[in-house]
Amino acid sequence: MPTLKIRGAELYFDTYGEPVSGRDPILLIHGSYITGSVDWSGVAPRLAQEFQVIVPDCRGHGRSDDPAGRYSFREMAADAAALIRALGHKQAHVIGHSNGGNVALVTLMEHPDVVASCIPQAANAYVSADLVERIPKKLDPERVRVEDPSLMMEMIELHSARHGVDYWATLLRRTAAEIVSEPNYTALDLARVQRPTLVIEGEHDATNAPAAHGRFMAQHIQGSQLWIPVGIGHNVHTDAPAAWCERVLEFLRAVPALQRH
């Protein structure tokens, strides 16, 4: 089982493919309360035909521990940067989905030296009022236990072996607390970005489309691209994997390799 000690946590990760000369690897960051393999197994093999792909379980998720209980986008972004370096890479193409998209964005903002390019999908640069209103109710463990027991059982299956059978409720509470707190980037903050960026947001993403978070990021990150797939919701890469891979690989092929920067 491949693991590395990263900033006090034992992080599990999978790799797909071998290093490709002249091409930085891809780092895929999973979304809320799931794992890397659950989120990315449908697209990682296709990406690995052209790039090496690294897929970790974020701290406190799946097979990665979190002994200090430090759940935050900033902590996970620092982990991402440290993992890239620990694996011997100077940079990686950092792609994230949902809360993983937030982690990808924070990695871009706080650790730009390790980012060759960034693809935040279904992410938000700031905490909008609708998130504060909806998320604590949606992720309340008692509501989930009664109204969405399948989610509870999935979380128990994914996380209990490493973290205990009751950990799912703790993870939901930590996730909700972070979503209504971070990130908090302004238009001026985003204007500082100097890395190629592709923002992805499904047309019908119920989490982020109402506040037009994707458009906000793309509007203020200089030179960024925005892809809004028509008729798709929060999970573009699983709902339309072929189209997603085609668009992402088209973008990545155009990113100059590190040695040509």
Pin down the residues of each PLM region.
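Acidic beta-to-alpha connecting loop that harbors the catalytic carboxylate
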Residues: 32, 203-206, 231-233
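Active-site nucleophile elbow and catalytic-triad environment of alpha/beta-hydrolase enzymes
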Residues: 173-189
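Catalytic active-site module of serine/aspartate enzymes centered on a nucleophile-bearing elbow/loop
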Residues: 224-261
